[in-house]
C-alpha cells in the first residue's frame, strides 16, 4: 500500500505504532478515539497500512492494542473492538480499553465483552489511564498514558514517505542498471565502441538515490540509538518498522550495480576519445604555429603615454583571448591523453605520448611568449601610470606654490605647511617609484630580443629606451624646481607660524595679567593678625608682583618680535594696535592695585608692631605718662587703616574695584577694632593708678 495515496488519512492519526513494546516484546498499537465522528473505513485503512509494516517475525510475537476511549462513546469503542478481529492478525494477545473517569454502565460493558469473548479470540480489559502501567512498562507508553516514550506522528510519517520513495526509486534504478550492464557484457564489439548516448543513461541520477539512501540510513541509525545522551530512547522506525536491513541491502546492490555502470561508461568513453584527440591536437598545433605566432610578431611597442600603453594592452588581451580558447582545448586534450595513458592500453601508448609531447612543446612556447609580452606591457602601463600621477602631483604642488599665502592664524599655517611637506614627500616617493618602474622596464626591454623570431627590433627598442629615460629626466627637473620653491615657501610659512605664535602668546600674557589682577582683588585681602603674619604677606605680595612683572615683560618682548616679523613678511600685525593697549591697560591697573595693597600692608604692619609693643610692655607709673602719646598714635593708625579698607581702588578710566567682598572687609575690620579696644583698655588701666595717687 502506497503511503502517498492514503496520506490525508494517515495525517489524522487514527492509529499509530509508537515503537513501544509490551512485556512479551510485542508491538503496541494505539487507537486514539478523539471524537464520535471517527470513520471506521478510514480506521480500517490505517490499521491495514500499519500492520503491513512490521516483519513476520515481529507479528508472530503478537500485538497489544490500546483503545483510548476517554473522549468517545461506548458504542464507538465497542465497534472498534469488534472490528479488530477482522483487521488485526490472530496474534493479538491483549486489547486494553482506556475508560473515562465517568465510566459507562459496568454491567452493560462487562456483559458485552463477555458475550463476545469466544468470537473475539483475544482478551479485552477495561482500565483507567493512570493504571495502564500495570500491564505495560511506563517507558513503553507515550505521554498521553503517563509514560515517557516520545512519539512525533508527523515526523514518523515524513520519514516513512522518504523510506517508501527511496525503496521505489532504488528498485527501479537497479532494474535499469542491470539492463545497461548486462547489455554491455553481451553486446558486440561495434556496440561497445559506440559512445554513451541517452539509451545508456538511467532515468534517475544514481548519486542522488545513493545520497538519499545514506541519509535515510543515517537517520534510522541515529534514532535507534538516540538515548545514548541521557534522553529517553525512542525507536519507532527501527528494523521492525522500517526494515532497516532492507535499506542496507538496497544500498549495497545500488553501489555494486552503479560501480559496474561507471566502469562500462568509462570503457566506452575511453575508446571513443582517441580519434577525437588526434584531430584536435593537429588543429591546436596548426593555429598556434600559424596565425597565433604571426599576431605576436607584429606587436613590439609599449606606447609613449598611459593611454597608448592601455591601447597596446587591450590589443594584447584580444590576442590572449584568442589564444585562451586554444589553450582551453589544450588543457582538455592533455587531461584526456593522461586519462588514456593511465588506462594502460599498450597499442595506444606510443602515439599518445608523441601527441602529448608535441602539443605541450608548442603550447608552452606560445604561452611563454604571451606571458613575456603581458609582463612587458604591464610594467609599461605601471610606468606610465606612475609618471602620469607624478606629473599631476607636480602640477598640484606648483599650483600651490604659485598662490600667495594670506596669513589667517597659526593653526591654518601649520596645516598648510604640513600639507606642503606631505605633497613634497609624496613627490619624492612617486619619483623613486618612477625610477624603479623605469629600470624594470628597461631590463625587460633588453630581454625582448630573445622572442623576436629572427625579427630585428633594435629600432623599436631604442625608441622605447629613449622615451623611458626622457620621462625620468623630465620628472627629475620638474621636481628640483618645485623643491627650490618649497624651500622659499617653507621659510616664509615658518615666519608666519612664529608671528602668529608670538601674537597668541602675547594675548595669553594679557589673559594671565588679568587673572593675576583678579586674584589680587579677590584672594589677596588678608592683612594679617599680627606683625609677623603681615610681614609674611608683604613678602608674598612682592613675589606675586615679580611674577606679574615678568609676565608683562614677556608680553612686551613678544609684541616687539611681532613688529620685526611683520616687517620681514611685509604685513601689518594685528597685535600692535590691539594687544599692546590691552597689555598696558591691565598692567597699569595691576600696578595701581598692587601699590594700594602694599600701602595697606605697610599700615597694618605699623599698626600691629606698635600695638604689640604697647601690649607686651609693662611700664611703671612714671613712664606711663610719657607713653600716652603712643597710645593715641596707635589708635589713630588703626582708625586710618579702617577708613582705608572702605576706599575702592580707582583706575585711570574711572572704574572702581574693592578688595574682596563686604564680608571679607568686615572680618578684617573687626580684627583691627579688637586690637584698638585692647590698646584703649591698656591705656585705661594705666590711667586708674595715676588718679588714685593724686587723690591720696
From Swiss-Prot:
Residues 1-153 form the CRAL-TRIO domain. It comes from the Eukaryota. The keyword Coiled coil does not apply. Keywords: Repeat. One of its GO terms (molecular function) is phosphatidylinositol-4,5-bisphosphate binding. The keyword Transport does not apply. InterPro entries: CRAL-TRIO_dom, Spectrin_SESTD1. Spectrin repeats lie at residues 272-378, 381-494, 500-602. Gene3D superfamilies: 1.20.58.60. Pfam families: CRAL_TRIO_2 (PF13716), Spectrin_SESTD1 (PF24915). Signal peptide: none annotated. Belongs to the SOLO family. May act as the primary docking protein directing membrane turnover and assembly of the transient receptor potential channels trpc4 and trpc5. Binds phospholipids. This is SEC14 domain and spectrin repeat-containing protein 1-A. The gene is sestd1-a.
